[in-house]
Amino acid sequence: MLRAGTKLIQESHWTLVKNILKYLRRTKDVFLVYGGEEELVVNGYTDASFQTDTDDSQSQSGYVFTINGGAVSWKSSKQETMSDSTAEAEYIAASESAKEGVWMRRFLIELGVFPNASSPLNLHCDSNGAIAQAKEPRNHQKNKHVLRKFHLIREFISRGDIKMCKIHTDLNVADPLTKALPQPKHETHMRAMGIKYLRD
């Protein structure tokens, strides 16, 4: 939002800058903490917000991958294509997330630290529609217009690289990367990513 408005600065942009500075001041005592489990626990979370950009009606994607409760990879970005529905936006976000997950899984296997090389990486999603599209493509003929590159997630699932898992919206750690949240909910998600305050 802030980056998109650098050409024409308005009062709302100054408000955004002030909010960012307040956030930085408020979070100066924040650290990223990883759990001390003996075995690595890797989880991925994906989310999307449907047509959140009021200027061009594009959706926002976000993902977070954690190892032992601490974030190791995350991304928030505007989707490059228009979505017709929330499920489609979530499916596109899941596909982009799956690519990162497959790369991470292979990297950890090459290092010899992935807990079980034959197990898929769990990718948590709060959209039943997106999960169904990824797992059962033959039942979704109305989504033929979705760009072919987003269907790569189906191959990842069939190869056993990724396993799509349903998660409740309130527990989806990627939620803050797609939209603004009330502060208590935002802080709950931050803690789930391994972000802790010095006072904790």
Task: Provide a role label for each language-model segment.
Residues 4, 41, 59, 77-200:
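RNase H-like nuclease module associated with reverse transcription
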Residues 45-87:
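RNase H-like nuclease fold core
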Residues 29-30, 41-43, 62-64, 70-71, ...:
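Conserved active-site beta-strand-loop modules that form the wall/rim of enzyme catalytic pockets
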Residues 22-46, 116-117:
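Structured nucleic-acid-interacting core domains from mobile-element enzymes and related host factors
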Residues 36, 46-48, 67-69, 125-127, ...:
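Residues immediately flanking
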Residues 26-30, 51, 71-74, 107-113:
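Conserved helix-loop functional segments at active or binding sites
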Residues 1-4, 48-50, 63, 129:
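Contiguous, well-ordered alpha-helical segments that form the cores/surfaces of helical PPI scaffolds
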Residues 1-29, 168, 176-178:
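C-terminal reverse transcriptase regions that engage the nucleic-acid substrate
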